[in-house]
């Protein structure tokens, strides 16, 4: 039963919100526009503020929905976190689009909002401040995810959640690094 929810979470993650936004707004594949990334930041740059925000909300919701379904099914905390990872992996490597997806930032935020709500809200607020002052999504994400583990510890959450608050952002960061290198080559 838990593996079924992991698979469902992966499939939720594969919902291609940026891809659909690209076709709905310009009749073009977003992976052929801007930085070729299928995520909210590229949608914002190439399609405009409204489309970028819509993609961000949908991508965040994919992560939150995966966790909500796993919790509703009564899965153990380990399986719930695995479902969150599966949603991020689905976003990053969707089977329907040749495994060419986004970087997973918004989906990971959606996951962490339900795994560690208060720490994620605080770090999300801090990330938003960094974004407002620097206009850099990379800097905002680095601060938000880079300090999330510390906020999780300060809130006294279990060690598994601390490890997850480090591991999930590592997946996002590595995906960003790999995709950025490919775009430079």
UniProtKB/Swiss-Prot annotation:
The membrane topology term of the UniProt record is: Multi-pass membrane protein
The cellular component terms of Gene Ontology attached to this UniProt record, alphabetical and capped at eight, are: plasma membrane
Give, as in the UniProt entry, the pathway in which the protein acts: Lipid metabolism; phospholipid metabolism
Q: Which residues cross the membrane?
A: 1-21, 47-67, 69-89, 113-133, 137-157, 158-178
Chief localisation class: membrane
Q: Which GO terms describe its molecular function?
A: acyl-phosphate glycerol-3-phosphate acyltransferase activity
**What InterPro entries does the annotation carry?**
G3P_acylTferase_PlsY
What binding partners and quaternary form does the record give? Probably interacts with PlsX.
- What does the sequence similarity comment in the record state about its family? Belongs to the PlsY family.
Protein purpose = Catalyzes the transfer of an acyl group from acyl-phosphate (acyl-PO(4)) to glycerol-3-phosphate (G3P) to form lysophosphatidic acid (LPA). This enzyme utilizes acyl-phosphate as fatty acyl donor, but not acyl-CoA or acyl-ACP.
Protein name listed in UniProt: Glycerol-3-phosphate acyltransferase 4
Species source reads: Dehalococcoides mccartyi (strain ATCC BAA-2266 / KCTC 15142 / 195)
